[in-house]
């Protein structure tokens, strides 16, 4: 019979059990909901890959990740389970437990009867934790299994004579395996020691542990295995010296080769000796021999592996570094130039004289007429004000490109630099934020703008394509599909930006005016995922936490859901093994709007190559990482209407091999399309990427020096020029100085960003589209800011990817030109006046323009009202670059007048303000030359008139006629080109 006290405990026990079951139920519910979310995300991700025709790539990647996880987990589980089984097998059959062994007694009472279950659970849990890190190695695993060999004369590293592919494809995964194996053995050894203690094989009766003989055998074998794994690690560490950053340059330098390499070899043999000692100790009593072996190992690791190399570096290398490091500097130079794609840069000299003649100025009117009057970074508000048409439209990015304008009467026309932007919907500015508005009605942007960067009408841009519905001027390309479902910089981003197309709710195309009803449309493409059954709808409703998808009668089985609509996010999701540029840009091709995104293959394992300087890159650039190898071998092209994505292998354009891309093409056959299959209308708009040239220019400034001693002394080393800035004149970037680790003063000036320009490259006969950046000599604190050279990257199909450096005499560089502009009284007075009269001044980016054998700089001067802030182009600044204070500044209300201010030549337009002409500008010319100049002036004047009027067909014809006259003028005057070295 129960006592009253026992009866009183029953309700309390029942209540506690009830609360426990409630907690368990809540936990199970939370896990279930989380699992549903995970499963829904997993399933809908697969549907997304299927929608862009990459389902096979998704499956392959999933199988690899799952295989790595379960493979490493199974391996760890088996080894640990066997070891714990051995522990149970070696447990003493009889054990006298003292008072201090209470923990062991309880363990044996409660756990020993369930030893197999406990062993299995522990092995499973620890194995799953240990294997989780293997999932992230999928990239290295795929490169390991499918990596191809490098070919060519520099295919082997100079130290170990192994193919470079070994370092890029094999070494990273092998290093992971060795590291994982060693850490796993350490974890297993700890678990085994604990298990032996709980089983009584290890006793600590009075503070001095005792180990049973059979336990010593077990632990000795485990420790020997750890020593063997460490030995393999030392072998791999030898190869990793090729990536060392301990010397003057990256790679195995003198101390690495003559001190660290022998030390690693010695440590390899000592680790093998330690393994043998541990196995020999199985038949000996005590641990004296293993302790001696491990102690010797630690002593050698410290003395030979750390202290000895430090002594060699300090005593032998540092006093004679310029002599001892020369062979290794030579290796670093060759590897870096090859790995970063700057080993085939063409070098030319550019005289940069101030001797332009009148015929030369006129002969270069195609270049002067193509300077960018409209800087997309500063004038974006102007384009938005004039062309957004509705508050909910925005131009999230403006890009610089070039387009061919057709001429009349069969004339070939001409190429014009264009500012290009796509009109996208900004969700945050919609008239209403309801679910229907956000996801069903305002689903897409509409149309694009194409505006000549070299033309202005009433201080505002001219437009080749504008308005809604889209209008194309004569001679300009036509848009047949203006709807934009996929774009850049989606304001919401992620899953929140999904839209539904082809629903019962008409989608808004555009509203021509506030008094008119919106024009609507229905989607007829195959973009996104079709909601064709109950399970697909349910999965997306769970993923987004939005059950309107499930219950709305506006959504049908034909509706298509688009939920990854940012171009960069799409590419990152589809090809996570590539790195991506910071600046996708739109292209109009065949009446369709496409987005082009540059993609890179990168590595930080190229032997002897220096890590790239990426400090000047935008924060969202995929090249913002540790890398010492890069290739722009892929162009991603996305249709703005359908979202269909193509990855084009463009390595054939630059005629450079890319073994990393070749490897990914083996891994994912059919994913990459040869550039030969890219439509010609798209190929015509490929650009050399800014991010890549930013990295290459930063490195080439030093690595154009190929003599090791000159490289060591930094003789003739260059930096990318300090930026001249842009925007408000009073926001000039401040110059600050810091001291580096060698005690030298370094400047923290921002560097000049590359600029796309359409101009006649010295030595060429016609303008081409190029990416340009400038060099200045390396100096303490950037105190020397004269130009040292100009790097030009070709973007036209005929010279795509060709890098040319024009070395110049010490003429004023961009920062000095900026100072000259600020010191010009006409400019500074105008800025002061405008900034105090209800307006403000914005300066565009400074452009470097080679003209003949001279160098010009151009900068647009915008004025915006404080009450209606969108910039208008009011003034033009042109600088004729000289040296030591001889640069001349032209400033006027038209480009023609500013040029006349410099050259005192007869140009179409206004009369100049009359400054003293530069040397040679008044040379007498023959009557024939004068007639050609007059004809060129007439043709140029007519071309500008047609351009401002938006008659692009006539403009193309005018430009073609002008080119013919200019060719005659060049022949008549013998205009010189640059000399080559």
Where are these regions (language model features)?
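Soluble extracytoplasmic regions of secretory-pathway and membrane proteins
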Residues: 3-13, 19, 25-50, 54-949, ...
């Amino acid at each position: 019979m129960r006592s009253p006290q026992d009866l009183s405990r029953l309700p309390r026990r029942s209540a506690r059990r009830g609360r426990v079951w409630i907690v368990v139920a809540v936990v199970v519910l939370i896990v279930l909901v989380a699992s549903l979310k995970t499963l829904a995300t997993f399933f809908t991700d697969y549907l997304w890959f299927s929608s862009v025709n990459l389902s096979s790539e998704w499956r392959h990647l999933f199988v690899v990740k799952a295989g790595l996880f379960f493979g490493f987990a199974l391996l760890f589980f088996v080894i640990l389970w066997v070891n714990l089984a051995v522990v149970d097998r070696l447990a003493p059959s009889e054990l006298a437990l003292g008072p201090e062994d209470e923990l062991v007694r309880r363990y044996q009472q409660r756990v020993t009867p369930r030893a197999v279950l406990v062993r299995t659970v522990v092995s499973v849990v620890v194995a799953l934790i240990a294997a989780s890190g293997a999932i992230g190695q999928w990239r290295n695993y795929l490169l390991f299994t499918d990596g191809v060999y490098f070919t060519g004369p520099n295919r082997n590293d100079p130290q170990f004579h192994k193919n470079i592919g070994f370092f890029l494809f094999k070494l990273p995964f092998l290093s992971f395996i060795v590291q994982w194996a060693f850490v796993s053995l350490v974890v297993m050894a700890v678990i085994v020691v604990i298990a032996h203690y709980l089983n009584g094989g290890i006793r600590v009766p009075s503070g001095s542990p005792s180990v049973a003989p059979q336990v010593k055998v077990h632990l000795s074998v485990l420790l020997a295995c750890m020593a063997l794994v460490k030995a393999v690690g030392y072998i791999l560490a030898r190869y990793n010296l090729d990536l060392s950053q301990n010397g003057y340059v990256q790679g195995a330098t003198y101390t690495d080769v003559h001190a660290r390499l022998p030390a690693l070899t010695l440590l390899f043999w000592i680790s093998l000796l330690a393994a043998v000692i541990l196995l020999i100790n199985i038949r000996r009593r005590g641990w004296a021999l293993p302790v001696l072996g491990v102690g010797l190992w630690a002593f050698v690791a410290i003395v030979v592996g750390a202290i000895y190399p430090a002594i060699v570096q300090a005593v032998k290398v540092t006093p004679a570094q310029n002599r001892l490091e020369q062979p290794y500097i030579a290796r670093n130079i060759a590897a870096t130039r090859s790995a970063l794609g700057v080993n085939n840069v063409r070098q030319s000299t550019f005289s940069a004289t101030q001797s332009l003649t009148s015929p030369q100025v006129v002969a270069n009117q195609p270049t002067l007429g193509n300077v960018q009057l409209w800087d997309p970074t500063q004038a974006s508000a102007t384009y938005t004000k004039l062309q957004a048409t509705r508050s909910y439209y925005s131009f999230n990015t403006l890009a610089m490109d070039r387009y061919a304008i057709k001429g009349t009467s069969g004339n070939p026309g001409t190429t014009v630099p264009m500012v290009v932007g796509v009109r996208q919907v900004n969700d945050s500015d919609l008239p209403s934020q309801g679910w229907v508005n956000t996801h069903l009605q305002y689903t897409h942007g509409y149309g694009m703008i194409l505006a000549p960067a070299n033309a202005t009408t009433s201080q505002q841009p001219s437009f080749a394509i504008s308005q809604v519905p889209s209008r194309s001027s004569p001679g300009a390309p036509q848009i047949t599909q203006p709807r934009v479902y996929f774009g850049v910089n989606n304001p919401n981003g992620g899953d929140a930006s999904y839209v539904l197309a082809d629903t019962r709710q008409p989608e808004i195309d555009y509203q021509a005016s506030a008094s008119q009803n919106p024009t609507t449309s229905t989607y007829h493409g195959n973009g996104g995922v079709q909601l064709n059954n109950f399970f697909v709808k349910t999965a997306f409703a769970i993923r987004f936490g939005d059950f309107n998808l499930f219950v709305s009668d506006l959504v049908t089985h034909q509706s298509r859901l688009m939920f990854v609509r940012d171009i960069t996010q799409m590419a990152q999701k589809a090809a996570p093994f590539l790195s991506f540029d910071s600046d996708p840009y739109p292209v109009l091709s065949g009446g369709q709007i496409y987005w082009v995104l540059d993609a890179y293959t990168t590595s930080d394992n190229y032997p002897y190559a220096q890590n790239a300087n990426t400090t000047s890159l935008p924060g969202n650039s995929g090249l913002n990482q540790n890398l010492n190898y890069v290739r722009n071998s892929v162009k991603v092209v996305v249709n703005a209407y359908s979202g269909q994505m193509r990855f084009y292998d463009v390595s054939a354009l630059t005629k450079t091999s890319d073994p990393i891309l070749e490897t990914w093409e083996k891994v994912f056959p059919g994913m990459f399309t040869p550039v030969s299959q890219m439509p010609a209308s798209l190929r015509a708009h490929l650009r050399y990427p800014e991010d890549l040239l930013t990295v290459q220019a930063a490195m080439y400034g030093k690595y154009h020096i190929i003599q090791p001693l000159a490289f060591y002394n930094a003789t003739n080393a260059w930096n990318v020029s300090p930026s001249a800035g842009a925007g408000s004149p009073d926001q000039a970037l401040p110059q600050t100085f810091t001291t580096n680790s060698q005690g030298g003063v370094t400047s923290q000036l921002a560097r000049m960003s590359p600029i796309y320009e359409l101009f006649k490259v010295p030595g060429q006969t016609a303008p081409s589209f190029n990416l340009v950046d400038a060099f200045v000599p390396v100096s303490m604190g950037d105190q020397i800011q004269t130009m040292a050279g100009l790097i030009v990257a070709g973007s036209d199909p005929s010279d795509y990817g060709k890098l040319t450096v024009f070395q110049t005499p010490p003429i004023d560089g961009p920062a000095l030109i900026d100072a000259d502009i600020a010191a010009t009284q006409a400019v500074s007075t105008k800025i002061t006046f405008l900034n105090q009269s209800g307006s403000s001044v914005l300066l565009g980016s400074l452009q470097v323009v080679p003209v003949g054998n001279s160098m010009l700089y151009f900068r647009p001067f915008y004025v915006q009202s404080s009450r209606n802030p969108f910039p208008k182009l009011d003034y033009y600044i042109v600088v004729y670059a000289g040296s030591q204070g001889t640069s001349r500044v032209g400033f006027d209300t038209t480009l023609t007048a500013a040029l006349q201010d410099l050259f005192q030549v007869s140009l179409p337009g206004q009369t100049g303000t009359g400054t003293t002409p530069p040397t040679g500008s008044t040379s007498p010319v023959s009557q024939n030359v004068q007639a050609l100049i007059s004809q060129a002036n007439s043709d140029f004047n007519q071309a500008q008139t047609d351009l401002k009027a938006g008659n692009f067909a006539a403009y193309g014809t005018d430009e073609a006629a002008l080119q013919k006259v200019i060719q005659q003028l060049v022949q008549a005057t013998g205009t010189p080109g640059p000399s080559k070295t």
